[in-house]
Amino acid sequence: MVERFLIGGVAVGLLLANSPTLAQAPARTTLVNPSQSYRVAKTDYVVLNRGEVEAVIVNNAAVDDGKLPGHRGGYSGIASLKRGGANKNLFVPSYAGLNFEHIHDGTSQPREILFEPRHALMELRVIDASTVELYQAPTPTWGLESATRYAILADGTIEMTFECIPRRDTFRNGYIGLFWASYIHQPESLAIHFRGRRKEESNTSWIRATSPRHGAAATHVHLDDARVWKRDNDFPLSLVYNRSNYRYADPFYFGVNEDLALVFMFRPQDEIRLSQSPSGGGVGNPAWDFQWMIPQYEVGRRYQMVMRLQVVPYEDSESVWIRSAPHRKALASDAVQKGEPTSRDSR
């Protein structure tokens, strides 16, 4: 079993564990937890099965075999998601879901820099039969080190825990912008659904949100999210800042594919921004996305985000709300321990 990684030939596990800033709360990934054992996968993907769900977790290498035919390089996360023995992958087979897509600071940069998570090498780590991680060493441009844990729970829900440490002072606007994309394979509807209201309204109801084209009315923020992010006028990622007129009330949304609801749920304290594109994965293949912003970041400090993805039979919005309740409750009660560095207590 591999007990810790090396950077430049220097063991860093003990150094990080003894850091008063980083050791204030239990680590949930191998990023700063030297006691967490793992093995490095011999292949570019690992299959997780539990409940009625099969999830294939892949690094960002290209794969073309019987399990992942034609999977393109650059797309990491859940390369295949199936439920109940169905043959159809709910995600676009050549792409992925919960794919770590962008690192940015609001400044205009070349495409390869804004898509750096696609290009920097990822190591696939196996924790146990139900848990794997994608580790990415400090990236060449941004210097962001990260570990993404995918754990399949008893009912087949995927819990994703992302931990990162900025290793260099590279984010010129003082914040870190992170973006995850899920490319959905030919759903009946391109819409996503959440509880919220229009900006000018006072009553909360179910919202059926669509985007007329890529980058238009793309992002929905929380009712109380009044944060303003400095950015260049020619910043090229059109999904990031182009907001809709909707505000969500609960950190949750879902879309429907093959009579199944894909339910994305988040911790309230992570202040996630919901995003969507009608054509992110090609014609008829929408992208159902989310963003996490880390304000006033500190070099060497650990930041953490937790979310869950559930696949349940779709009847109507209320049935999805009821079925997802235990997971939403668990995320809401996942209180940040005193001293744990997160986006909220780093301001």
Predicted segments with their positions:
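Bacterial N-terminal signal peptides that target proteins for export
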Residues: 1-9
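Bacterial N-terminal signal peptides
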Residues: 8-17
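Boundary at the C-terminal end of the N-terminal hydrophobic targeting segment
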Residues: 17, 21-25
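Beta-strand-rich recognition/accessory modules
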Residues: 25-51, 224-345
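Acidic-aromatic substrate-binding/catalytic surfaces of carbohydrate-active enzymes
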Residues: 36-117
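Extended, loop-rich substrate-binding clefts of extracytoplasmic carbohydrate-active enzymes
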Residues: 103-157, 164, 169-171
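Acidic (Asp/Glu-rich), glycine- and aromatic
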Residues: 153, 157-211
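Low-complexity, serine/threonine/proline-enriched polar segments
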Residues: 196-240
